[in-house]
A protein has these predicted regions:
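C-terminal ends of transmembrane helices
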Residues: 24-27, 98-110, 138-144, 186-190
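Interfacial segments of multi-pass membrane proteins
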Residues: 51-54, 77-81, 100, 114-145, ...
Length: 212
């Protein structure tokens, strides 16, 4: 195993370790004394479920924590391994944070979140193309009101620039990221046709917040 391969693995594990910090779990237990698994209809330890169940401030706290843990993992990887790996170090760490958030080891690799915030942070910190992908995902959510569709569109929209601009390795890592997001959101997406998938009117939530 080459030194650069070891560096890639370490970057991923750094991200995975930080990704295991479940901000939603901390916020929910702080405010309710209960685990996030008992919160709302889904029990998902993510911003959307916390915001729907506990309000805007709690949701923003979760959003902030998930952004910080992903960005911090990418920064640390860049500082330690950036000289040898360049921006690859950031992507491996960010991907590790997404996997850690989705499959936290302290929850026995289950009951993790869906990784939307971590995914967005990874893409935005990595490249302006990532910001465009996130904007496209946000527009999709505003139009459809389905968070699960946006969660799939965001990494999928980054696939073309990943291969065309950054090369095959980033492209393949983005395929992994897209597949991970697809697997996490597909169960909810399948319920759209039956009308059982919960809608989230983000714009309406923001309007109500401004009136308060």
């Amino acid at each position: 195993m080459t030194q650069k391969m070891v560096s890639r693995i370490i970057c991923f594990l750094m991200g995975y370790a930080l990704g295991n910090f479940m901000t939603a779990e901390v916020v929910t237990r702080r405010l309710t004394g209960r685990p996030c698994a008992e919160l709302g209809k889904t029990g998902n330890p993510g911003m959307a479920n916390v915001m729907r169940s506990l309000g805007m401030k709690a949701g923003i706290a979760v959003l902030t924590g998930d952004i910080l843990k992903t960005a911090l993992s990418m920064l640390l990887a860049w500082l330690v391994f950036g000289t040898g790996l360049g921006r690859l170090s950031m992507f491996y760490a960010g991907l590790g944070a997404v996997v850690g958030h989705d499959f936290p080891v302290w929850l026995k690799m289950g009951r993790g979140g869906k990784g939307v915030t971590c995914c967005c942070t990874l893409l935005i910190v990595f490249s302006p193309w990532g910001l465009l992908a996130c904007i496209l995902g946000m527009i999709t959510v505003f139009v459809t009101k389905y968070l699960c569709i946006g969660g799939i569109v965001i990494p999928a929209a980054f696939l073309i620039p990943a291969f065309a601009v950054f090369g095959p390795e980033i492209g393949l890592l983005t395929v992994v990221l897209t597949g991970l997001c697809f697997c996490k959101h597909w169960p909810a997406a399948k319920e759209i046709a039956s009308g059982r998938c919960e809608k989230t009117d983000v714009l309406n939530m923001l309007r109500k917040r401004r009136r308060q």
